[in-house]
């Protein structure tokens, strides 16, 4: 399904332009992110906290889940379930971001960027919720 087909399907369901933009953003975020789990596996595994066993496996599994979730939000029948899955996955990877803040010397990322990542994570959670769970028909205009 291409972007135009997705837009047409969503418009038939009377989704707001804002929610459509949110869905597109969430799709791109997780689709690109999921691919990066396979293209940069070692880099991704390096941010997994040491208490998580088999970091490479964790990265690969989360990459598959990101790709499945991204594809799932495109389909009206699976959108809500995929949104819940992406929401939970986003919560599940938050300890990696906290670990990076606790040990910034291990990573080649400015500390300010590590701090910025936390509110971005919250905004992403809100966007996932709003664009996948709260789809409401537009009110008819008089």
PLM region descriptions:
Residues 2-142:
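Membrane-interface extramembranous regions
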């Amino acid at each position: 399904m291409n972007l135009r087909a997705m837009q047409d399907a969503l418009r038939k369901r009377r989704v707001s332009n804002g929610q459509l933009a949110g869905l597109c953003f969430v799709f791109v975020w997780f689709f690109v992110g999921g691919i990066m789990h396979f293209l940069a596996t070692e880099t991704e595994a390096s941010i997994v906290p040491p208490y998580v066993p088999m970091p490479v496996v964790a990265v690969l599994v989360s990459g598959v889940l990101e790709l499945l979730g991204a594809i799932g939000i495109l389909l009206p029948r699976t959108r809500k379930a995929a949104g819940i899955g992406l929401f939970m996955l986003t919560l599940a990877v938050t300890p990696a971001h906290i670990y990076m803040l606790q040990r910034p010397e291990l990573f080649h990322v400015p500390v300010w960027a590590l701090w910025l990542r936390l509110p971005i994570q919250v905004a992403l959670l809100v966007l996932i919720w709003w664009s996948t769970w709260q789809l409401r028909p537009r009110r008819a205009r008089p």
